[in-house]
Amino acid sequence: MTENNRLSVKLPGLDLKNPIIPASGCFGFGEEYAKYYDLNKLGSIMVKATTLHPRFGNPTPRVAETASGMLNAIGLQNPGLEVIMTEKLPWLNENFPELPIIANVAGSEEADYVAVCAKIGDAANVKAIELNISCPNVKHGGQAFGTDPEVAAALVKACKAVSKVPLYVKLSPNVTDIVPIAKAVEAAGADGLTMINTLMGVRFDLKTRQPILANITGGLSGPAIKPVALKLIHQVAQVVDIPIIGMGGVANAQDVLEMYMAGASAVAVGTANFADPFVCPKIIDKLPELMDQYRIESLESLIQEVKEGKK
């Protein structure tokens, strides 16, 4: 078996030569990282969130360092669907035609999500949609879509009805019980899950006596959240039959294999890209050696082994 075959995985809409995917919000649309290496080396790319209209994001400061991670409250800043469809995604496809694109979709109400999902699958090389259901629902008092199984299922069903590509739903860890939400979105037609999104946190400035972030709270990411991600992925993998793209604190090849042990079928790398722009290709290069060390023939065989273990 060649190294390429050992690392390749097939998911709904995604035929990946390797499982490593830069996470949405940590890689922009690839322009900055393309200065460092050929993005065709990646398995896929989860591009920055797309909303129907441009969003300018939250006031600054938007980021704060924490032990083994960071807090961010960017606020889904993006140029909006039209610019992304006419400029950002065509640039990616033209320069990196071998790179499958996963479009991340966000919104403030169901109609916004549906409008974006109906169109973004038309862009060349967009093979799947990642639905960010952690956004506040302005029509339900600001409660995030992803905290209520019925609300989440209704959103997924509406988006699935118009989407031209498979739909992966990004689950929030900021809930009492993630299992009913995972089962609800699967029943509503989700083709896969991505998890986990960031945990909520806050830091204070001792001099000003105020929160460091202008938004007060932010999303906690980085190595600090990996055990939480592994626990929730393992929990959800026991009860769903759709594939999971695991994320949360991944920084090296060992972390990737841990995600597989928990039940993931591919892995997204987020905050680690800020510390080392080359982290994704480094992980890809290291994986075959580590798989040899632990007698793993291929990632597909590991997926099957983990599935057999949960029966």
Curated annotation (Swiss-Prot):
**What start-end ranges are recorded for coiled-coil regions in this protein?**
none
Instruction: Quote the record's binding site residues for FMN.
Output: S24, K48, A49, N104, N132, K170, I196, G222, G248, G249, G270, T271
What does UniProt give as GO cellular component?
Answer: cytoplasm
Q: Cite the cofactor comment.
A: Binds 1 FMN per subunit.
Fetch the InterPro entries from UniProt: Aldolase_TIM (IPR013785), DHO_dehydrogenase (IPR050074), DHOD_1B (IPR033888), Dihydroorotate_DH_1 (IPR024920), Dihydroorotate_DH_1_2 (IPR012135), Dihydroorotate_DH_cat (IPR005720), Dihydroorotate_DH_CS (IPR001295), Dihydroorotate_DH_I (IPR049622)
Kind of enzyme, top EC level?
A: oxidoreductase
Pathway note? Pyrimidine metabolism; UMP biosynthesis via de novo pathway; orotate from (S)-dihydroorotate (NAD(+) route): step 1/1
Q: What is its main location?
A: cytoplasm
MF terms (GO), sorted A to Z: dihydroorotate dehydrogenase (NAD+) activity
Secretion signal: which residues?
none
What's an example Gene Ontology biological process for this entry?
A: 'de novo' pyrimidine nucleobase biosynthetic process
Under the heading SUPFAM superfamilies, the entry gives:
FMN-linked oxidoreductases (SSF51395)
Q: Where in the cell is it found?
A: Cytoplasm
What is the pH-activity profile?
Optimum pH is 8.
E.C. number, please?
1.3.1.14
Q: Does the keyword Cytoplasm apply?
A: yes
Q: Which reaction does it catalyse?
A: (S)-dihydroorotate + NAD(+) = orotate + NADH + H(+)
Question: Entry's PROSITE patterns?
Answer: DHODEHASE_1, DHODEHASE_2
- Summarize the subunit comment: Heterotetramer of 2 PyrK and 2 PyrD type B subunits.
Which purpose does this protein serve, as stated in its record? Catalyzes the conversion of dihydroorotate to orotate with NAD(+) as electron acceptor. Cannot use fumarate as an electron acceptor.
What family does the database annotate?
Belongs to the dihydroorotate dehydrogenase family. Type 1 subfamily.
Q: What is this protein called?
A: Dihydroorotate dehydrogenase B (NAD(+)), catalytic subunit
> From which source organism is this entry?
Lactococcus lactis subsp. cremoris (strain MG1363)
Record lineage: Bacteria, Bacillati, Bacillota, Bacilli, Lactobacillales
